[in-house]
Amino acid sequence: MSAPAFCKGILSFGQPWPQFDSMAASPVIGEGQSAIADSQDPRAVYQTLLAADALRYVTLQVTGSKGSGHPGGFASSAEAHASLMMLGHTNIVTEVGHHAPGFYSAMFLDGSLAQMGIHNMDDMMTRFRERHGLLGHLSGAIPGLLAPAGPLGQGQHFAMAGALLHPGKLFPVTIGDGGMGEPYVLNSMMHFHTAYPDITNFLPVLVWNGYSQEHHSMVSLFDNQAMTDYWRGHGFEEVILVDAKEFDDAGQSGAYVDSTLFSHGQRLKFTAAVLAGVDRAAQSALGGKLTAFIIKQLKGAGVHASGAKSHNLYPKDTLDQPHIYESLQKRALPEQAWAIVRDNLSRAGGGPACQTAVTEQELALTPLPALEWQHFNVGDKAVPATAMGAMVAQVGLADRRFVVTNADGNEASAMKNINDALKIRHPTPDPLYNQEPGGQVYEPLNEDACAGLAAGLALFGSRSLWLSYESFAINGWPIIQTVTQAMAELRRRTPAVVCMFTAGALEQGRNGWTHQRPEIENFFGAMMRNGNVYLLFPPDANAIQAAYAHALDSVNKGIVIVASKSLLPVYMTPDEARTAVRTGAGMVHAAGTGQGGRIVFAVTGDMVLLPVMQAARQLEGEGHAVQVVSVVNPRKLYRPGDVAWDSVAQPDGEFMSDSDFNALFDGDVLIGVSGGPSAPLEPVLLRTRAPRRDVFCWKRGETTASADELMDFNGLTADAMAARARQLLADNQS
């Protein structure tokens, strides 16, 4: 038999294995089937091992083609990954970005990559680790793949989100022993299981290979009992471990061994144990038990090196080097084996993953009714966070799939109205705390768990909201950044991942500097240039409703709303607020004759407007014209060329025009003011034509008795701002 067309470019073919004619005469997954019928069937075991070695071979050749990439970690999971696919469980995610070449190999072997023009091995090598090709790490941009993976310790969130949205489907997530504690992998699953005890259809698959990237893993000294106990201690009722060492007939030393060095018979026995174990684990997870599967096998099994030395390839590790080419020869399969592997994997799960993965179609959203606004009068006072909470409650009552997450507690964020309406999800009913087992508010004391579930739900197509104290958002932000970047290249529409951070630094005087960390706004500010990230600063209770309504209507974006939980003045009408969110900024004050010069204050934030307004009144009394402009959506104030907006999915190329910008910000002096750091003011400073300009912003935290005292400590006072404006005007005239 000649090799199938997709094998064009494969460098080495091998001889048929023993019993090939009887065990691989035809695919064990027949036409019209989606999985093997019996995991105990010797033919199923045999063909699962063929798939495992095919995965290893493609992984090593494609990484060798560029002298780049990471073959070793995935290689030690090959039997488990092949087993999952052969059993029809193809909605697989991972927390290990370094397993990308293996996941790409799986998508190549099931035919999914043909959707992006990769039809054979030559195509795959050409497109590997290239722009518009197979990205360096996993992304939902690749047909058949559900979620991104780069930073360790995130994949479990995607598996849990998938399980919550799709009962009855299994969501395996591979986890490396190097990344197992990085930082909250098991902790987040434990929290989720407490809140959602009936959602067990996600399956952690621990790839326990004894090594991390450059050394022995920190759990390499665990014995099998200790590892099993560790998972049981985190709430897993069923822990199934298959240890390659128990099948070794090659006399390998150490606790971690390479199954590809076994005799053929022992390789089949090991594969049979893995296949049966994965099948048992899958049925357990789908049957209502929190379950984990562990494959224990040496890192680098079957590729060019072992242990941490197999982790990645360097430029010298190319296909013409003996250690690479000889390793490929050892894994080489006969031509007819490749046809068997393709037929099996393209049928597993009901078809190629590019057709059957749950993320290949948009999830239908529950239609929302017209949301009721609270219309606050300009000049009155209202709490922004509470105003938003009322709107959030309406969303949750209309969309029962909607989840709100908050590690610090909605009540502490002046958003108790969310808990009143939607209830905190907890197995202990308690009306005093608004707790119910079926609640829609997820409040584990773990920012990563909160951000992770919200981000995972948004990526997989459902509405969610992550709420946090601004000071502690940094502990959950990494997965939000991962998801916003994934959304930028997603091939489908999905709801924006929406965050609201309150209890800003100026509100936290008595709590001291541990609760005063607004510097994260600089992080968000830098990400605005990504093209699909928006940092919103509503100045009042009307504007925060406009900001949240805007976020609800957005797709494939990351939206961060920063607002206070304090009683503050209302500056904008609802219509003015909607316009400011859409266009980028809005005037909240304009007065004075202008005989002494025109001063413009460009302000991000709400509470910091208090001293700005005081400074404005001082200056107006001296004959100056003063405009106070609330910078509500600074992403809209950049110039188009400043932002990679045209490189992202669902692009937004609307920016404030020069004429509109100049109408708001033209003056003799422009002073940017922020209650946090200065980066969000960058677009204003880039575009202003004011001949004199300066910035007042946060410096550092301190324990104070009031917001006024804390602003004074940071130089954010009316007197300081007015004095600086006078000096700049004088400089302008000299």
Predicted features, each with a name:
Residues 77, 103, 157-159, 224, ...:
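Short, highly selective alpha-helical patches that border small-molecule cofactor pockets
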Residues 40-44, 60-68, 89-90, 141-147, ...:
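Glycine- and acidic
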Residues 2-68, 116-149, 339-356, 360-363, ...:
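Conserved internal helical-beta-strand scaffold that buttresses enzyme catalytic cores
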Residues 40, 48, 55-65, 74-196, ...:
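Cofactor-binding active-site loop characterized by glycine-rich and histidine/acidic residues
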Residues 50-51, 343-495, 577-596, 605-607, ...:
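Non-catalytic terminal/interface segments that mediate subunit docking, oligomerization
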Residues 121, 126-203, 276, 410-524, ...:
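Thiamine diphosphate
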